[in-house]
Design a protein with these regions (language model features):
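Cytoplasmic helix-loop-helix junction between adjacent transmembrane helices
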Residues: 1-28
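Hydrophobic core of transmembrane alpha-helices in multi-pass small-molecule transporters
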Residues: 1, 183-198
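C-terminal ends and interior cores of transmembrane alpha-helices
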Residues: 165-179
Length: 262
């Protein structure tokens, strides 16, 4: 899904409008996710929901929407024919490298930031869910602002700001262990960390600017694969490090973010 989603965005949205338009799409996605999560939280006990019911209803609604779109919009014409095979081009090496580092950063957030909240502060499922809802609401508000900032200051400055911010956030995660900082600081870092995901749109629009139009679809597929290479080994490797020193995991994450900054 994400490969097709990113490919179509970069093909159809004009370069000058891309940062703002993609940011609105991100805000809309966060808003819909917020509503879905909130409905589950509010109706789970009231309606006696189960995982099976939630997945069946969600999957059924998605299938109905897909069928509607299939018949309502039978064909979209892309402005540029796309290469139908995978490609690797040397001139996209920086984009590939940044995608790999972005994947590593995502794994650290998904696996270890949440684990910290549970292990260190004993967060329950409902508390983690509430924290996630807060991050979604924040993205609804902040994502359009980030799109405007990227449009004004450019991708390079936006990405440098993201990587510098991530270094600070990961070091602060380590400080939770080294200095015994409390739950409010940790929760705030979790929200800020998640907000930084919105700055990933700068990497998308950077690629849109440097890519040959016919390379967008195949490179989106390659980049998505590169992004997930870290998911193969990083959680296991850092998981062993976590057993020795949880703070060291976040120090290593800060080092990775600093590599992207450089």
């Amino acid at each position: 899904y994400e490969t097709v989603n990113q490919s179509l965005q970069l093909q159809w949205i004009a370069k000058k409008d891309a940062p703002q338009t993609i940011s609105w799409l991100m805000a809309m996605g966060a808003a819909v996710t917020f509503v879905a999560y909130a409905l589950i939280v509010l109706t789970w006990d009231w309606l006696g929901l189960t995982y099976n019911i939630v997945y069946m209803v969600s999957g059924g609604l998605t299938a109905l929407i897909a069928l509607f779109c299939l018949f309502a919009y039978p064909q979209f014409e892309a402005p540029h024919p796309q290469i139908k095979t995978f490609i690797l081009r040397r001139r996209y090496w920086l984009y590939y490298a940044l995608q790999f580092m972005a994947g590593a950063r995502r794994q650290i957030f998904v696996v270890f930031a949440g684990f910290m909240m549970v292990e260190r502060f004993g967060f329950r499922v409902d508390q983690i869910t509430s924290l996630y809802l807060l991050t979604l609401f924040s993205n609804v508000v902040i994502a359009p602002v980030i799109g405007k900032v990227v449009g004004v200051f450019g991708e390079r400055r936006a990405l440098l700001f993201e990587y510098a911010g991530l270094v600070a956030v990961f070091l602060a995660y380590g400080g939770v262990y080294y200095f015994g900082w409390g739950v409010m600081i940790a929760a705030g870092l979790y929200v800020v960390d998640h907000i930084f995901f919105a700055l990933a749109l700068a990497l998308k629009t950077y690629f849109q600017k440097i890519a040959d139009p016919q390379d967008i679809a195949p490179t989106a597929a390659v980049a998505f694969t590169i992004n997930h290479i870290a998911a193969v080994f990083l959680p296991a490797g850092l998981g062993y490090l976590w057993l020795v020193s949880p703070a060291a995991v976040f120090i290593a994450a800060a080092a990775m973010a600093s590599v992207s900054f450089v």
